[in-house]
């Protein structure tokens, strides 16, 4: 007898960029009475993270093909077939109404297994350049969504799910209303830190033609080194931390953010309403540069690609950003934000459930 509650199987793994948006959609549907289960891999972050959110997870064995040697490539077809069969077994045992693919290696076999089982597949691509798995699955999916324009020619642009505390920040015009004094520069390099930001910013900020307050999130194990770099350049009052526990508070504090342009960061910055200088991670398909491009085009951000980054290029960029300009950029960022991605994807999933 079929369970009266609708069921969603989420396929996402490998990185937070895939897992966190999947959790956001899952939570939205859970609040509407849906049952949620997850398909992932045992050796990646979803194995620990997903159960902490009260969601049961099944595992399949699958790895990426890029960078593999000839021997592994030769046996890869057999491994993929095996992963599809594993996924199909889990799917037929639980019988979801819809399967949601958020990217990562696990989505490929899982999506094919769902299709073979006659279960509708919904895709969400977080980046401006579609991952290989989502490129394949887009041909069999019932609905395809993208966070930024350009990943797919005809997919609906719905943004990325953004945490609620960021979406609820006051409008930039309110935050800037009583603000004066030094420009507040927030540097964020992610949990591991961004080596190029840690090396460059302590040299850049003393050369600016206006005074600044600095909050530099340096990443695990980098706090002392970065702090010393600021001191070596004559800055003794920089706030250097390994992590930022309350990201929303950091966005609210900042006049300008200097950071990479991963998909979720770009979406958060837009929702928060903060003017940014993006230094995209170098990748052959320019994924991070393309993530940032729509905010650059709408006047919400500046971008310096890593191959063009020098101390002087960043000095010149930041020197042109006085507070009135930063308020304008922040308002443009907020105006460009899409903050209901989880609701939009959840609505599509509900429409496909029989």
Curated annotation (Swiss-Prot):
GO terms for biological process: carbohydrate metabolic process; cell division; cell wall organization; lipid glycosylation; peptidoglycan biosynthetic process; regulation of cell shape. Pathway: Cell wall biogenesis; peptidoglycan biosynthesis. Keywords: Cell cycle, Cell division, Cell inner membrane, Cell membrane, Cell shape, Cell wall biogenesis/degradation, Glycosyltransferase, Membrane, Peptidoglycan synthesis, Transferase. Cell wall formation. Catalyzes the transfer of a GlcNAc subunit on undecaprenyl-pyrophosphoryl-MurNAc-pentapeptide (lipid intermediate I) to form undecaprenyl-pyrophosphoryl-MurNAc-(pentapeptide)GlcNAc (lipid intermediate II). PANTHER family: GLYCOSYLTRANSFERASE, UDP-N-ACETYLGLUCOSAMINE--N-ACETYLMURAMYL-(PENTAPEPTIDE) PYROPHOSPHORYL-UNDECAPRENOL N-ACETYLGLUCOSAMINE TRANSFERASE 1. Its EC number is 2.4.1.227. One of its GO terms (cellular component) is plasma membrane. It is an enzyme of class 2 (transferase). It catalyses: di-trans,octa-cis-undecaprenyl diphospho-N-acetyl-alpha-D-muramoyl-L-alanyl-D-glutamyl-meso-2,6-diaminopimeloyl-D-alanyl-D-alanine + UDP-N-acetyl-alpha-D-glucosamine = di-trans,octa-cis-undecaprenyl diphospho-[N-acetyl-alpha-D-glucosaminyl-(1->4)]-N-acetyl-alpha-D-muramoyl-L-alanyl-D-glutamyl-meso-2,6-diaminopimeloyl-D-alanyl-D-alanine + UDP + H(+). UDP-N-acetyl-alpha-D-glucosamine binds at residues 15-17, 127, 163, 191, 244, 263-268, 288. It is found in: Cell inner membrane. Belongs to the glycosyltransferase 28 family. MurG subfamily. The lineage of its organism: Bacteria, Pseudomonadati, Pseudomonadota, Gammaproteobacteria, Vibrionales. GO terms for molecular function: UDP-N-acetyl-D-glucosamine:N-acetylmuramoyl-L-alanyl-D-glutamyl-meso-2,6-diaminopimelyl-D-alanyl-D-alanine-diphosphoundecaprenol 4-beta-N-acetylglucosaminlytransferase activity; undecaprenyldiphospho-muramoylpentapeptide beta-N-acetylglucosaminyltransferase activity. This is UDP-N-acetylglucosamine--N-acetylmuramyl-(pentapeptide) pyrophosphoryl-undecaprenol N-acetylglucosamine transferase. Pfam families: Glyco_tran_28_C (PF04101), Glyco_transf_28 (PF03033). It is a peripheral membrane protein.
